[in-house]
UniProtKB/Swiss-Prot annotation:
PROSITE patterns: INTERLEUKIN_2. The gene is IL2. It is found in: Secreted. Belongs to the IL-2 family. Disulfide bonds join 78-126. GO terms for biological process: adaptive immune response. Cytokine produced by activated CD4-positive helper T-cells and to a lesser extend activated CD8-positive T-cells and natural killer (NK) cells that plays pivotal roles in the immune response and tolerance. Binds to a receptor complex composed of either the high-affinity trimeric IL-2R (IL2RA/CD25, IL2RB/CD122 and IL2RG/CD132) or the low-affinity dimeric IL-2R (IL2RB and IL2RG). Interaction with the receptor leads to oligomerization and conformation changes in the IL-2R subunits resulting in downstream signaling starting with phosphorylation of JAK1 and JAK3. GO terms for cellular component: extracellular space. Glycans are attached at residue 23. This is Interleukin-2. InterPro entries: 4_helix_cytokine-like_core, IL-2, IL-2_CS. Residues 1-20 form the signal peptide. It holds the Pfam family IL2.
């Protein structure tokens, strides 16, 4: 009698452990998504830092909120909340001499990747730092965040 209950308990425990444990393929997928996010952020930063960008000084006047602490994928919620202001600043800066190709597509790609990485259940309330960041600082910090998470996955 007790043997059957014990075996059932063991079977359920094993099923729970195997279904909730991250697999190497999910880790690999996460790493690839982070690498794509990293490339998109770097592409925006490179476009902004382009020596031909006459509107860089204007772009630097816009401020972005940064989380106090960004160490886990759930903190990508804070990046997601700043995507619309980022897109607006990038659109304002478009000119004949400076044009980031497909700004809307880049922001859309970033948004999709962020949603997949942080998970749909995330309802994290971002705790923002007291100081704001320029667009360059903002992008650099999120690039560093991606690099740091990628390094923990490899």
């Amino acid at each position: 009698m007790y043997r059957m209950q014990l075996l059932s308990c063991i079977a359920l425990s094993l099923a729970l452990v195997t279904n909730s444990a991250p697999t190497s393929s999910s880790t690999k997928k996460t790493q690839l998504q982070l690498e794509h996010l990293l490339l998109d952020l770097q592409m925006i930063l490179n476009g902004i830092n382009n020596y031909k960008n006459p509107k860089l000084t204007r772009m630097l006047t816009f401020k972005f909120y940064m989380p106090k602490k960004a160490t886990e994928l759930k903190h990508l919620q804070c990046l997601e909340e700043e995507l619309r202001p980022l897109e607006e600043v990038l659109n304002l800066a478009q000119s004949k001499n400076f044009h980031l190709r497909d700004t809307k597509d880049l922001i859309s790609n970033i948004n999709v990747i962020v949603l997949e990485l942080k998970g749909s259940e995330t309802t994290l309330m971002c705790e923002y730092a007291d100081e704001t960041a320029t667009i360059v600082e903002f992008l650099n910090r999120w690039i560093t965040f991606c690099q740091s998470i990628i390094s923990t996955l490899t």
